[in-house]
């Protein structure tokens, strides 16, 4: 998975 959800904030791993 390229995008991971954290605190409703999408960021690229």
Swiss-Prot record:
Its main location: secreted. It is found in: Secreted. The modification Pyrrolidone carboxylic acid is found at residue 1. The keyword Secreted applies. Signal peptide: none annotated. The keyword Cell inner membrane does not apply. The record marks 10-12 as: Cleavage. One of its GO terms (biological process) is blood vessel diameter maintenance. GO terms for cellular component: extracellular region. Keywords: Pyrrolidone carboxylic acid, Secreted, Vasoactive. Interacts with NTSR1. Interacts with SORT1. Interacts with SORL1. This is Neurotensin. It comes from Cavia porcellus (Guinea pig).
């Amino acid at each position: 998975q390229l995008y991971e959800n954290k605190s409703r904030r999408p960021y690229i791993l």
